[in-house]
Amino acid sequence: MILACHNLNKSFGDHLIVRDGSFHVEDREKAALVGVNGAGKSTIFKMIVGELPLDEGDVILTKGKTLGYLAQHQNLDTTNTIYEELKTAKSDIIALEAQIRAIELELKSLSGEELTNRLNTYNRLMSEFESKNGYAYESEITGVLKGLGFTEEEFSKPTDTLSGGQKTRVSLGKLLLTKPDILLLDEPTNHLDLNSISWLETYLLNYPGAVLIVSHDRFFLNRVVTKVIEIENGSVRMYTGNYKDYAQKKQMIRDAQLKEYLNQQREIKHQEAVIEKLRSFNREKSIKRAESREKM
């Protein structure tokens, strides 16, 4: 398990968002958080990442694990181009590469023990660089940008000239490249065309970490998630399976609730008819029996 939410409680004044809501996300699991507009999905995301305080409850992220959050509104560095902005997601690799290149220049003028020490450092840094797939980070950036619908000609566009939708795509690409252990994605398919949505589906299915998604695109959810977490009238319930499985189980619950309601209504009408019949006898004993049924 990578994320656990226990007995979450949150209200805004008299407006209840969630009462004693609990759910969890396993390592590498792809899950959806669903509910009608205003149910509290984005609020729960903000509580998970600490942007909003909880009234009560606990949010537990496994120690040592990282969390990345794509909100519906993002801030970008307006001095960067699209490509430069995504490079910031690989700043650790770029810093490693700079250290390696600096040591390579030093090695030419070193000898003896000093050379041995610097070679040890060089080998350690190279091992770390390779483990982070450092040789491929530029092609990885290019692949993500193209997957999200940007052409190579657009890579050099300044971020301050982009539309809101383009900025959201840049923010999504940047988050994907940071590769946190769990991704929280709020409406990730907004501003994506069909090809980009298809690319994102494949990317998330192969993503090595966990993913928790809020989306109105049920077709996207159906292809990506294996668990659905529903928030409804302040209550939280988990369903195993994709979105189609959830919808079928939800319909079965509604059908059972409707059947129970109709049975109750039939029983009420039956009791009312018996009461009316007993009262019509206008005898003391019958009236007492009728009053007894009214209390049932």
Predicted regions, residues:
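ABC ATP-binding cassette signature C-motif
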Residues: 1-262
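A short, surface-exposed helix-loop junction/capping segment
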Residues: 119-127, 270-281
